[in-house]
Amino acid sequence: MSIIKTLSVGNGDMFYIKHGSDNFTIIDCNLIDELQEQIVEEIINEKKGKTITRFISTHPDEDHIHGLKYLDEKIDILNFYCVENEAIKEELTDDFENYCKLRDGEYHYYVYKNCKRKWMNINGDNRGSSGINFLWPITSNESYIDALDKAKRGESYNNLSPIFTYSLNGGITAMWMGDIENNFMEKVKDDIDWVEVDVLFAPHHGRESGKVPSDVLEKINPKIIIIGEAPSEHLNYYNGYNTLTQNSTGNIAFKNEQSKTEIYVEKGDYPYDKSFLKNEGICDCKLGAYIGTLMLEDK
């Protein structure tokens, strides 16, 4: 059993995965001031008993690293995963400086397509892996090299984002894309070995600017798309696909078991379609308000 949680942190991203193995993964960081202590306390409590904690940074935009210095001070990040880059910023913040310290420091690991690492996707020393696999970047790709150059000049960072999945044996596969932009994905989509997923966290918080191309959606065939907390006028609602909109759910927790995933939300009065979920009449109240179960019998 594992837990994926997408935290409601305003116009930004933050997730964690409490693996069934001896692993705990944090993805991005947007510790808005009023929730900073509460979220970090939750992370500290949830990762108790896990020997390995990793932080995956998709890219260094402020809404993905805000509060990173505070988090690092509280949990001491010893496994920092990011793409290899030389991003700079004209206006330095404490969090970007902390990002650079971790990116360039002793405990970084640079991710790329099909990278292998013990306990990330390789078992070892009687400890299971995390089930995390990277589909992108291909570091020799010309469009990606151009994105690296733009970050090195301090112009933009979104297209540094890796694409990766988390899979539970016999259960869920979820995909993250950071803030990859639509026009960039159109250039590189044919170079990526797409896999089918159950849950897609829409890139760029669900914005139209991050819309996943239709032919890519057909290949990954998501059962649910999670749309983030960008302003509603900027969102693409992925018509024709089952969605949960985090502006209306608040936090979302996925309790993953073989052949099914129970879904819990912060706001129990979620007003939109949930008919794609099976109501099993169960409740794990500490995770939130139960809204249904995504059945995965084909696993």
Give, region by region, the residue ranges found by the protein language model.
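Core dinuclear metal-dependent hydrolase active-site scaffold
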Residues: 1-50, 112-196, 253-299
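Hydrophobic/aromatic beta-strand patches that form the interior of the parallel beta-sheet core
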Residues: 5-7, 25, 56, 81, ...
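Active-site metal-binding motif and surrounding structural segment of the metallo-beta-lactamase
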Residues: 23-25, 34-87, 191-207, 218-225
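Internal alpha/beta domain cores that form substrate/cofactor-binding pockets in large enzymes
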Residues: 63, 90-92, 105-107, 185-191, ...
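Short, flexible/disordered intra-domain loops and linkers
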Residues: 34-35, 87-97, 150
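Active-site-proximal beta-strand/loop segments in catalytic clefts of secreted hydrolases
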Residues: 28-30, 57-60, 83-85, 113-115, ...
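Residues at alpha-helix caps and immediate loop-helix transition turns in enzyme cores, especially N-
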Residues: 36-39, 67, 92-95, 212-213
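A metal-dependent hydrolase metal-coordination microenvironment
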Residues: 62-63, 97-125
